[in-house]
């Protein structure tokens, strides 16, 4: 293996987001496949005896040299710290440039309010430094941590003792890989799954179908192999910042993830989708049981007793982009409209009109805890108080100056207290700097079950019909936000789809739109999942972007479908020698599981068909 050259400022790069709202990395010259430590830890590998199991191509079916084995034994002491960073940075690293200015906007959750970002990724313009960072974080940093952890767990004197942690690490790697393939499509995977070090500048791609196949088998093998009851197993508890060493929760998460993935491919591979879904729905560990099972990241800013490190930076990602950076990320017009229109049972709020005059309106109670009203100022942000003469106002995605402006702030920002109380978690300022970010929540798992029931899938863990799980999903989302039971009940009783005959109509497409739209509300602010679900189902019915600076890469009137591979792939011989990869490398190209376009050539919304 050739030695890979690593950018010497990796650690600094991961912390820049704390100190600057955004930065352009277009000039960064970095090998995205440069696995850290590949010179002394990659080593020469020797194949084991032939493996004819169905997991042969994902197993670590090789041995390393005695010297490397000895080195890996020594790194076992570092496993807790490595695992902690693996979990923390997984979806979170450089959140603004890798996610907020792309996925969160494409999902319809937020809009860009910073004129200097216009024409870039928020408006379909490709920003190589930004996309390249997402790619590099996965292939360089997270894959290095994954490789080191797996090899440490296997190449020691008692590998059976580390079996649970071996497979827990693989579950999380599959979780990260899902976000990567759902961003780009086809991608290098097979060598990384096996914790190998690929040859520099000649890294083989797998089709997205192959990537999904490998991820399904990773999850199946992991859940079948983990033994939560085995007290002899090595455990990482405090540094497992997701589930604190609870192996059963990891198994429930894996089953929930497997169901998410099964539904993702339901339009392109319905038989495989049903097989994987029913396996998850019949597994003895079940799916997520409550909001206590949420897969989330606690910011380092949070106090230690909350699971953080009581640091001065690394705040909640969305709160940073919205409030800490002075209003760059704001409520979208799409989300504002859904807050207002999905139920007639919203919560009252008052707009002051004068000394003795006011207007009472209703809105989704989650909006009242997540967003400030419009026209916030430095003083009102410092005090954490709404501008009570104003209303909630969302920004259209793709808006340009002067319709977007950092001064004055025209649109709603996240409810965040900037100063002394930033470490607290008040219910009425949900996006305080210490608030965890949920990447997969209990509410989502219930909406997944609703769709599974709608599709006629079966399982011992599927005990209600689609409407029952739909109601439960909305309630779980309200519970997550600590909405009072009376307000939650009023909202649910007023949901339009529960009062207009949708679930009695027999029209599965109509029912699916209700399920996905309310699921989209519950998944907020996870743009990775919101955007993927929108591309898969074409729900919810989002507005078209006002601006398109893709240079024709995304046809006018169309929705963006993927991100481009980073420019560094021009150095990858495999990529440059496969014309089909280059031909598919446009932001308007649908991924494997995205079987139908959202809009026609004139930009008009097409009627979705999710039951082929």
Positions of predicted regions on the chain:
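Sec-dependent bacterial lipoprotein signal peptides
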Residues: 1-21
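Membrane-proximal, proline-rich intrinsically disordered regions
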Residues: 22-105, 155-156, 552-612
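Short, compositionally biased low-complexity segments
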Residues: 25-30, 43-63, 111-122, 185-193, ...
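Structured, solvent-exposed acidic/aromatic patches
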Residues: 73-77, 112-172, 176-481, 505-510, ...
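Beta-strand acidic-aromatic groove motif in beta-rich domains, primarily in extracellular
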Residues: 95-105, 185-188, 274, 532
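Short coil/turn segments at secondary-structure boundaries
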Residues: 99-102, 370-373, 527-536
